[in-house]
Amino acid sequence: MAKSFFYDIWERKELNNILKINSGRDYKQLNSGNIPVYGTGGYMLSVNDKLSDTDAVGIGRKGTIDKPLYLKAPFWTVDTLFYCTSKENSDVKFIYLLFQIINWKRYDESTGVPSLSKNTISSIKTYVPKVKEQDHISKLFFSLDNTLQLHERKCEELTL
């Protein structure tokens, strides 16, 4: 019989109960280096200082608001990209998976350039299991993603 990884019921919580939303900052005063800088479109360049030394999930504040990024520490984010760190009761990789299924455009606060605020993100409600189950789920999906990427690279090599 297969071992079940699912233990408890999932609780409905606001995102502010499982994560902390941090603001990006301007990087132009920094020198070139090996720390990646991310904006809403992804990787931009590398600098010599970090904004965070904890893995996080990036979500656009302005512009592209519906393409979450998994940010491996250390990193820097510009001011148009929030970075969300996990609280003690949550797994950052699980938060990334949650962010993939949220309909971010539904929470757009603008009449022009798509925008999100910390308050809006904080108040989004979702269902969350205990951290142990979050860890199992995130490991499963990240393993599947890694396997898919490996096979995609192999297919690309075969077509060359």
Describe the role of every protein-language-model region.
Residues 36, 82, 139:
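Conserved, well-structured core segments
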